[in-house]
Structures are given as C-alpha cells and as structure tokens.
Swiss-Prot record:
Residues 1-16 form a transit peptide. Binds 1 zinc ion per subunit. The keyword NAD applies. It catalyses: N(6)-acetyl-L-lysyl-[protein] + NAD(+) + H2O = 2''-O-acetyl-ADP-D-ribose + nicotinamide + L-lysyl-[protein]. GO terms for cellular component: mitochondrial matrix. Residues 28-308 form the Deacetylase sirtuin-type domain. NAD-dependent protein deacylase. Catalyzes the NAD-dependent hydrolysis of acyl groups from lysine residues. One of its GO terms (molecular function) is histone deacetylase activity, NAD-dependent. It comes from Monosiga brevicollis (Choanoflagellate). This is NAD-dependent protein deacylase SIR4. The active site is at 147 (proton acceptor). Belongs to the sirtuin family. Class II subfamily.
Length: 308
C-alpha cells in the first residue's frame, strides 16, 4: 500500500498539541484514514509505551488462541503441571516437537515497524504478552516479557535459568528411540507456546529431563494459566506506562487481566490510548475515549511508519 507522508506543517501541528479524535473506527472505515490517525497519534504522544499480544506474531506464522476458526483449547494449568509427572511428560513430549517451530520463526513487518519506531524515539518501552522473543529478534530494546520467555527453562527448586536449546538437546538424546515414532495429529496443531498435538501413545514412554544442578522439576520460563506474574515484571510494566505519554496496544483482545489492567492504569493516569487489533477487545465499551483501529496490523503499522 502506498502511503503519503504527512505534510511537515501537519506534523509540527500535531506535535504542538493539535487535537486527535477519540472514537472507535470500525473495520469498514477507510484504512488510509486510519493510517493517518495512527501516525498522528504516535507523533503527538511520543514516546508511547507499546503493549503487544499474539496478534502481532500471527503474520510470522505463530497462531493465536482466540482467532475465529481456531479449535478450542484447554490451556495447561500451573498447578496441574507441577503436581503431575504425567502432565510433565505430556508437555515436554509435545514441546520437543513444537518448540523448534517457534524458535525458528522470524519477526514480521509489525515487529520491524515497532523496532524502527523505537529507534526513532516514538516508542519507549515495549510490554509483550508473547513468549516468542520476536521483538528482541527484530532488534527492539527495553522489552518487558510479561508472560516470560519460551527460550528459557527454570528449575522450580533451585530457580536456575538455562536455555531451552540446551534442554532440547538433552530431550533429544534421552528420547532417541521415540523420535521416529512421533506422529503429529494435524500439522496446524503447533500453538503459540510451542505446544503440539501428538499421538497419545507417546506420552507415557517419554523421558523428562530434571535440573542438571539439583535434580529439580524443570518448567518453561513462561506463566502458565493460574500462575503468577513475576512481581518485578509487573512493577517494570507499571513504571513503563507511568513514564510514557500514551499507551499503544497492538494485537491483543485484552482478555487476560494482566493485559487489561495495563490499559486500566493508562486510563486512570489520563494517558491517551490507541488500540490496533483486527477483532474486538475487552476495552470495547469499557474505556470511554480512545482511538480504536480495527484493521490489519501488518498493513497499517508499516504504512503508518512510512508516513513519519
């Protein structure tokens, strides 16, 4: 899409305080107008704090949980994983297959646009609900991984952190006899957390690796459902919102409280909010005034960047 750059006079007027609309813009609204409004929002409120969700990574081939047509999924619970060796076998067997898909995924134009906006000083901190590390891979700094990192593994006993690649090598070595028996139920079954649906007969024969330092239970360094966020990450996210001029939400329905409370904080602190998401969000009808762009992220973000 060709996008006309903002006229320098308009850019200066926006930076000087020209009013921006605070209305919901539907998916049927002119995309070019939405691009101009987003460009104006970013200029007017630099630096903005960015909050991202699964929708920013779908163009990289990582599916989300809530898009239309996605099969229903019961997420693994934190206590369920810790309390059952069978659940640990099931998780790590599926992750052994699914993790490389996430590890080898590349950032898309949305990640790259946010990185460039940060490089230009229009974006400050980036808070992400994603565990894929794609913001960092795109070159972004000051990224707060609110739900952890899939490329890390944590011991639940000694709390040491090791790399997921190191564990992958151990799992492959310990389960060499099973590898040729891996049968994926359907190819689209790899999920945002690196989980994959495999033949049920494998799980009971899968060897789970223990912590190399203390023999404790290993868990991916991500927040399972029912688990608690790292208090330091919560504090850093709150500080990032407070220090920013505005909040820019990208690719999330805000269904989880951990994400929605960040928006609530921005509203309580009278920060302008812009939401760019291809579908409805929890903020719809709740936040009284904000810029809502119900438009494709991979189309709108790069086009807005080209206008600046």
């Amino acid at each position: 899409m060709a996008a006309t750059k903002l006229h320098p006079a308009l850019r200066n007027a926006i930076r000087a305080g020209a009013n921006l609309p605070t209305e919901v813009i539907s998916a049927t609204f002119d995309v070019q107008e939405g691009i101009k409004l987003l460009s104006a929002f970013l200029l007017r409120h630099e630096p903005v704090c960015v909050l991202t969700g699964a929708g920013i990574s779908t163009d990289s081939g990582i599916p989300d949980y809530r898009s239309p047509g996605r099969p229903p999924h019961r997420p693994l619970q934190h206590l369920e994983f810790l309390g059952s060796h069978e659940r640990q076998q099931r998780y790590w067997a599926r992750s052994l297959y699914g993790y490389p898909r996430i590890r080898d995924t590349m950032p898309n134009v949305g990640h790259q646009a946010i990185n460039e906006l940060q490089r230009r000083g229009l974006v400050g901190a980036i808070i992400t609900q994603n565990v894929d590390g794609l913001h960092q891979r795109a070159g972004s700094q000051h990224v707060i991984d609110l739900h952890g990192r899939l490329d890390q593994v944590k011991c639940m006993n000694c709390h040491s952190i090791t790399t997921r690649d190191e564990l992958q090598s151990r799992l492959l070595a310990d389960n060499k006899a099973l590898l040729d028996q891996f049968s994926v139920v359907h190819d689209e079954a790899v999920r945002p957390d690196g989980d994959a649906v495999l033949d049920e007969d494998l799980y009971g024969r899968f060897t789970v690796a223990a912590c190399a330092s203390c023999g404790g239970v290993l868990k991916p360094n991500v927040v399972f459902f029912g688990g608690s966020l790292d208090p330091e990450d919560v504090k850093r996210a709150s500080t990032a919102v407070s220090e920013a001029s505005a909040l820019f939400v990208v690719g999330t329905s805000l269904a989880t409280w951990s994400a929605f409370r960040i928006v609530r904080q921005a509203v309580e602190e009278a920060k302008p909010v812009c939401v760019l998401n291809s579908g409805p969000t929890r903020a719809d009808g709740v936040i009284p005034e904000y810029l809502r762009l119900c438009m494709p992220i991979g189309e709108v973000l790069p086009a807005a960047l080209r206008q600046l």
